[in-house]
Amino acid sequence: LGIKMAVPFYQVQELIQQHDVAVFSSNYALYAEMSRRFNNTIQQFVSAKDIEIYSIDETFIELNSYSQTDLNELAQEIKATLWQWLALPVCVGIGHSKTEAKLANHIAKKNSYFNGVCNLLHMDLCSKEALFQHIDVAEVWGVGRKLAKKLHALKIHSVFDLAISDPEQMQRKFSILMKKTILEL
C-alpha cells in the first residue's frame, strides 16, 4: 500500500480503512528484548568493542579491524543467522562512513539485486556514481523531505548531486552538518 514506517496513524487512516488493514499497538518491551538478542547475535561474529548500538533497531559495526575478512560473506552470515535464530529480516549496508553505510542499507532494502547486502567499499567509482544518480537526495541520512525541497531548488536532486556539491558553499547555505554529510558521501 506504500505506507512508510513511522507515519502517524491519522495520515493513513483512510487508506487503512479502505483496505481493511489490521493495526496493532507497539510492544516496546518485546522490541527491546529483540534488540538485545539482535546485538548479542552480532557479537557471535564481531567484537563487542566494534559494535555501536545506535537505536532499538539499528547498529553500526566498526570494520577497520576486519580488513582480512570478506565483508560480503560476513554480512550474509550475520543476516542468515539473524533470520535463523530470531526470524528477523535484516539488510546490511557497508560504507566508508555511517552516512554511506546507511545509504548502502537503503540500497540493499530497495534493490533485490544486492540480496540484502550492499557493500559500497568494493564498488567501483563508476558503478557507485551511477547508483547515486538514481537515489533522491531525501534518502541521505539527515536530509529528509523538508531539506530535500531546499536542495531541489538548488538543482541538487540526487545523492550524486549532493556528493559533488561544494562542501564549503553548502555549509554557508545550510550548516556544518551538511558539510560533514557531503564529506561522508
Show which residues each predicted segment covers.
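Residues that scaffold, gate, or flank divalent-cation-dependent active/transport sites
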Residues: L1-I56, F60
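Short secondary-structure capping/junction motifs at helix and strand boundaries
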Residues: V21-F24, S47-Y54, L71-A75, W83-V92
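Alpha-helical interaction/regulatory segments in DNA maintenance proteins
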Residues: F24, A29-R36, F160-L185
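Catalytic palm subdomain of template-directed nucleic-acid polymerases
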Residues: F60-K79, K155
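Long, highly charged, low-complexity intrinsically disordered interaction regions
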Residues: E73-A138
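A short alpha->loop->secondary-structure connector
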Residues: K109-V117, I156-V159, K179-T181
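Polar interaction faces of repeat-based domains
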Residues: H152
